[in-house]
């Protein structure tokens, strides 16, 4: 079985199924420390990454941009002094798709190698 951080995103159309109630806890176990947030009725994955300063936070944001472009799936990114909040959800289905969990796992991989982490 391919782990989430090794998987690739698939095209997600408006008729793609959201992650089921049965799949959700299984997938969440593979991305510890990510939180479920619900905004405007839309379930999202969110995690805050801490850095020593703005420069390191911005570098992480740019690294996230690179992997997001490569996979064709893009997060919400809030870059602040010493902190980046990453939020994943699938806009087309207004909820969570397996792609969001794949990208959350990939985000954790990028964060492991990010310079200036707290």
UniProtKB/Swiss-Prot annotation:
Name of a matching Pfam family: Pterin_4a
Catalytic activity, EC: 4.2.1.96
Residues spanning the signal sequence: none
Domain of life: Bacteria
Any GO MF annotation of the entry: 4-alpha-hydroxytetrahydrobiopterin dehydratase activity
Keywords: Lyase
Gene3D superfamilies listed in its UniProt record: Transcriptional coactivator/pterin dehydratase
Catalyzed reactions per annotation: (4aS,6R)-4a-hydroxy-L-erythro-5,6,7,8-tetrahydrobiopterin = (6R)-L-erythro-6,7-dihydrobiopterin + H2O
Enzyme class name: lyase
Entry-linked InterPro entries: PCD_sf, Pterin-4-alpha-carb_dehyd, Pterin_deHydtase
GO BP of this protein: tetrahydrobiopterin biosynthetic process
Classification via PANTHER family: PTERIN-4-ALPHA-CARBINOLAMINE DEHYDRATASE-RELATED
Stated family: Belongs to the pterin-4-alpha-carbinolamine dehydratase family.
Name this protein carries in UniProt: Putative pterin-4-alpha-carbinolamine dehydratase
Organism: Pseudomonas fluorescens (strain SBW25)
């Amino acid at each position: 079985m391919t782990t989430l951080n090794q998987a690739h995103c698939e095209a997600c159309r408006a008729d793609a199924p959201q992650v089921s109630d049965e799949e959700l806890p299984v997938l969440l176990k593979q991305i510890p420390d990510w939180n479920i947030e619900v905004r405007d009725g839309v379930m999202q994955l969110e995690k805050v990454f801490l850095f020593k300063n703005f420069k390191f936070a911005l570098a992480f944001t740019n690294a996230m941009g690179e992997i997001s472009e490569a996979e064709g799936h893009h997060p919400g990114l809030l870059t602040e002094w010493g902190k980046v909040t990453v939020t994943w959800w699938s806009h087309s289905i207004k909820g969570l798709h397996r792609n969001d969990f794949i990208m959350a796992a990939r985000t954790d991989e990028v964060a492991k190698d990010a310079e200036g982490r707290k």
